């Protein structure tokens, strides 16, 4: 953690970012670490403590998703046993720093993506899987009556928004309708062929 590079000592303009990056790489530290203020590292440590519960569950759900996050090396050395939890917490800290509700929503969204979710997240994962199962039934009804399909879709959207899984239910209900319409024209073609023969 050296001090700022002086203009006279290095022989280049202070605003020259490429030259700074080269010097930082030759010294053995990346440009991001050398320019990062100490306050950001302290904020990341505080965010790690506050999001430990959600980060632990999220890390179990996605073991390698946060490997690209730039965590301070000092934190990794001091907290070696919970090292698996830190990248997830730092990724949440590096993401737009908002309320804990957003981090919990992100943690809820991750188990839906990953197949191996922890037992704690199994309840949350079963709830989103129950919603698509319920939406398949209205999709079947949609083939019969278009009006109930609109009502079923409007009922399922608030549930989907609260679970942050709005896109998959929409995709499931949309293909169900074209499949039924595609199967109905096929017999019509066969009937037309049968009539022509």
Swiss-Prot record:
<feature type="compositionally biased region" description="Basic and acidic residues">
    <location>
        <begin position="134"/>
        <end position="144"/>
    </location>
</feature>
<feature type="compositionally biased region" description="Basic and acidic residues">
    <location>
        <begin position="99"/>
        <end position="113"/>
    </location>
</feature>
<dbReference type="Pfam" id="PF05466">
    <property type="entry name" value="BASP1"/>
</dbReference>
<keyword id="KW-0519">Myristate</keyword>
<feature type="compositionally biased region" description="Basic and acidic residues">
    <location>
        <begin position="15"/>
        <end position="26"/>
    </location>
</feature>
<feature type="region of interest" description="Disordered">
    <location>
        <begin position="1"/>
        <end position="197"/>
    </location>
</feature>
<feature type="compositionally biased region" description="Basic and acidic residues">
    <location>
        <begin position="72"/>
        <end position="87"/>
    </location>
</feature>
<feature type="compositionally biased region" description="Basic and acidic residues">
    <location>
        <begin position="35"/>
        <end position="44"/>
    </location>
</feature>
<protein>
    <recommendedName>
        <fullName>Brain acid soluble protein 1 homolog</fullName>
    </recommendedName>
</protein>
<feature type="lipid moiety-binding region" description="N-myristoyl glycine">
    <location>
        <position position="2"/>
    </location>
</feature>
<keyword id="KW-1003">Cell membrane</keyword>
<feature type="compositionally biased region" description="Basic residues">
    <location>
        <begin position="1"/>
        <end position="11"/>
    </location>
</feature>
<feature type="compositionally biased region" description="Low complexity">
    <location>
        <begin position="45"/>
        <end position="66"/>
    </location>
</feature>
<keyword id="KW-0472">Membrane</keyword>
<feature type="compositionally biased region" description="Low complexity">
    <location>
        <begin position="88"/>
        <end position="98"/>
    </location>
</feature>
<feature type="compositionally biased region" description="Low complexity">
    <location>
        <begin position="145"/>
        <end position="155"/>
    </location>
</feature>
<keyword id="KW-0449">Lipoprotein</keyword>
<feature type="compositionally biased region" description="Basic and acidic residues">
    <location>
        <begin position="156"/>
        <end position="166"/>
    </location>
</feature>
<dbReference type="GO" id="GO:0045766">
    <property type="term" value="P:positive regulation of angiogenesis"/>
</dbReference>
<dbReference type="GO" id="GO:0005886">
    <property type="term" value="C:plasma membrane"/>
</dbReference>
<comment type="similarity">
    <text>Belongs to the BASP1 family.</text>
</comment>
<dbReference type="InterPro" id="IPR008408">
    <property type="entry name" value="BASP1"/>
</dbReference>
């Amino acid at each position: 953690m050296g001090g700022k590079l002086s203009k006279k000592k290095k022989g280049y303009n202070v605003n020259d970012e490429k030259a700074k990056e080269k010097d930082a790489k030759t010294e053995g530290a990346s440009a991001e670490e050398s320019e990062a203020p100490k306050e950001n590292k302290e904020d990341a440590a505080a965010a790690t403590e506050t999001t430990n519960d959600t980060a632990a569950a999220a890390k179990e759900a996605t073991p390698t998703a946060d490997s690209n996050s730039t965590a301070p090396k000092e934190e990794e050395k001091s907290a070696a046993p919970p090292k698996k939890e830190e990248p997830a917490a730092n990724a949440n800290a590096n993401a737009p720093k908002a309320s804990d509700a957003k981090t919990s929503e992100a943690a809820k969204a991750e188990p839906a993506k990953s197949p191996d979710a922890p037992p704690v997240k199994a309840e949350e994962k079963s709830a989103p899987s129950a919603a698509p199962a319920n939406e398949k039934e209205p999709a079947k009804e949609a083939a019969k009556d278009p009006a109930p399909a609109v009502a079923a879709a409007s009922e399922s959207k608030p549930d989907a928004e609260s679970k942050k899984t709005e896109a998959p239910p929409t995709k499931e209900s949309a293909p169900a309708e074209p499949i039924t319409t595609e199967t109905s024209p096929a017999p019509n073609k066969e009937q037309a062929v049968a009539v022509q023969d």
